[in-house]
Amino acid sequence: MTAYAAVFDAVSHRYGKATALDGVSVAIPAGCIAGLIGPDGVGKSTLLGLLSGVKRLRSGRIKALGGDMGSARHRRDCRVRIAYMPQGLGRNLYPTLSVVENLDFFGRLFGQPASERRARTGDLLVSTGLDPYPDRPAGKLSGGMKQKLALCCALIHEPDLLILDEPTTGVDPLSRRQFWELIGRMRVGRPGMSVVVASADMDEAAQFDWLAAMNAGRLIATGSPAEILSQTHADSLEEAFIALLPEAQRQGHKALVIPPRVPRPGPPAIEATGLTMRFGGFTAVDHVSFRIETGEIFGFLGSNGCGKSTTMKMLTGLLPPSEGTATLFGQPVDAHDLQTRKRIGYMSQSFSLYGELTVRQNLVLDAQLFDLPGAGPRIAELMEHYGLATFADSRPDSLPLGIRQRLQLAVAVLHRPGILILDEPTSGVDPVERDRFWQSLIDMSRRDGVTIFISTHFMNEAARCDRISAMNAGKVLAEGRPEDLIRARGAHTLEDAFIGYLEDAAGQPRNEQLAPARAAARAAGRPNRLFDPGRCWAYALRETMELRRDRMRLAFALLGPIVMMITFGFGISFDVKHLAYAAFDQDQSLQSRTLLQSFEGSRYFLAAAPVTDKAQMQRRLITGELALVVEVPPDFGRDLLNARTPELGIWLDGAMPFRAETTRGYVTGLMLQYFNELSVGSTGQTAQLASVNVAVRFVYNPDFLSVFAIVPGVIMLMLVLIPAMMTAVSVVQEKESGSIANFRRHLSPGWSSCSASRHLMWWWHSRASCRWR
C-alpha cells in the first residue's frame, strides 16, 4: 500500500469573492520531494498554508501524519512534526535577532533544553556553512544565507513533513544549488521525511520526484516529471505545462522565434561608465560599466538585491549616482531633462498602475502626463494589440496577473519610447503570458528599433537576450552573448556558467556535511497542552530582545508614559483658581468701585488691566487672556441709590464649560455677599431676596485639584493604551515580515497570537508604573 504525506479531498478556499482553490483532490506521496508547480495566483501557497495549519480549513478534508488536519487536537499534536517555510526570503526569520538567537527561539518553541539547543544549533550552522556568522543579524544576511538560516530554523526539531513555499525565488543560482544539495544530504540521513515544495520555476521543478501542476485553483496533472513529459510529448516541463493549460488560455500561443538583430547606425542608446551608488556605508552598485546599442535586447542577470533595480533607477534619473556617468542617446542622464526622459519607457518591478482608475483611464492619464495630443487612436491601437479592449472599464486590481502585465507594458510604450527599461517584468506570470510578452519585446526591438534593457533572475529569459551582464553584490561578473559566456566557462547551460562566475567571485565552495539527527525523538515526544508556558516564554523573551534593539519602540515604551503623565497632569486642568479678570467700569462711582473691590478680595480671581471698550473686551476673552470681565454700565451708582434696578454685565470665557460653570457660581456668591453687605450698611437689615434658592452645602468648601484626579487615571490609562499599542506595532511588523506564520502555527487554539507580547508588556509597565509612583 502506497504511503501518503498528505491527502486532499475536495478542498476549496476563497478570499472574499476570489476562489483560490476549487475542489482540489490529490494524494501526495510520502518520503519524496513533491512539487506544486504553476505561476503566481494558482493556489499553491493556499494549499500549503492549509496543510501546515497556518490557514484555517473551510471546505473539504485534509489528512496528514495519520490524522485529520481539520481537527484542532490533531493539529496541536502534529505541529512539532511539521516544518513550514513561508514564501519570501527568510520570511520566517526575525531580522533584528542574530543567527544563533533565531535558532534559539525556534528551539525554545519545541521545548528543547539549553544543552540540546546549543548542540543542534552548532550542528546546523556547520552543515549550512553559517558557522562564521553566528552573531550577524538575520536582516543583514544575503538572500542565500537567509534561506539557509530559514531552513535551519525549520529543521531544528527534525520534522517528518517539511513544507517549502517557493524557497529559492529571488536567490542566485549558486545559492539555489547549495540549498537543494543541503536538502538532498538531509534526506539521506532521514529517508522517511517528506518534502512538499511550491515552485514557479519549471527548470527547478524538473528535479523533483513527483509533481502536481495547478492552474486557476485546480489540478491539471500529477505524476513524476518523466510521466508528465511523456503524457504531453514535450521536451521541457515548461512546454508540458503550456500543453496542459485549457485551450482557451493557450489559444494563439506559438513557439517563440527570435530573429537575429541587424546593427543600426548611430551612437549607443545607453552607455554607463563607473556607475556607483552608495546608501550610507552600503555600496549597492559598484563601478558598473556597459554599452547597449540601438535596438538591442540587453539583459541584467542576477539575484534579488544584487543592484539591478538600483542601476535601472540611475539610468532613468530616479536616483542620482554617487559616482560615474551615464548617457542616453548620447546625452548625460539628467532628472530635470524632460525631453530625454520622454524617450524612456519604464516598467517597475511592482506594478505602478493607479488602482482607482480603469484600464482606459490609466492609459488616458499617461497620455496626458506625456502631453500626447490626439492620443485616442494610439490608446485604441494598444488596447487592441494587447487584448485589453474587453477589460477597458475594469480596474487593474481586479485583473489577472498576465492582463495587468500587458496593461503595464501598454502604459510604458504609449508614448513610443526609444528605450524601454523593464525591471523583473515577468515574475510570477504563466509561461503563455511570458511568451506573449517576449514576442512583443522582440517585435519592438527588431521592427521599431527600440532598445530594451531588462532585468531578470530567470535563466531561460536571460538566454533570449542579445547580450547579458551577470551581476552579483553590485558588481558585474561577466558580459557578453549568452552562448559566448557558456562557451567561455565550458558549461552546458547558462545557469552552470553563472554559477561558475559566482564561485570564482566567492572563492571555492566549502564542503558542508549534514549533522546526524538528534532531536527527533525529543520533539516527537513533547507533550502538547492547550496552553504551553514554555512557548509563551519563548515569545516573551524574543520580543524583549527585539524591543531592546528597536530604539524607537523602546523610547516610546519608556518615555511615552512619562510624557503622557506630564502632559495630562499639567496640560489638562479643571482648577478654578487665580482666574484673570478685568473691570469695564463705565460709571466710575463709589458704588461701582465698592463692587469691584469685592472681586479683589477673593483668592479665586486675579485682577488684570482694565478694559476700555467692548472690542478690546471681546478680543481679550477670545485670546484667553481673561476668564472674566465685570462690565459696570453708566449710572450704575445713581440707579442703585434711587432704588431702581441697575443691570450688571458679567462676561465669562466659556471655552471650558466646567470652569465657566464653576466661575459663574463664584460670581453669584460674590454678588449675593455684596448686596447683603450693601443692605446692612444702608438699612441695618440683611437683603430680602425675591426668591430663595435652597441648596445642599457640605461642611467643607469643595476644592477640585486636577493633578490628584488626572494623574492616577493617566497611570491606569497607560497600562491600557501603551501595551496595546506596542502589541499592535509588534503584530503589524510580524505580519509585514511574514513571521506571523510562526504565531499561527505554534500557538495553541484559543491562545491569541499577541497574548505573549501583551502579557509581557503589561508586566513590564506595571513594574515601571510602580517605580514611577
Per-segment meaning from a language model:
Residues R526-F708:
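Extracytoplasmic/periplasmic domains immediately adjacent to an N-terminal transmembrane anchor
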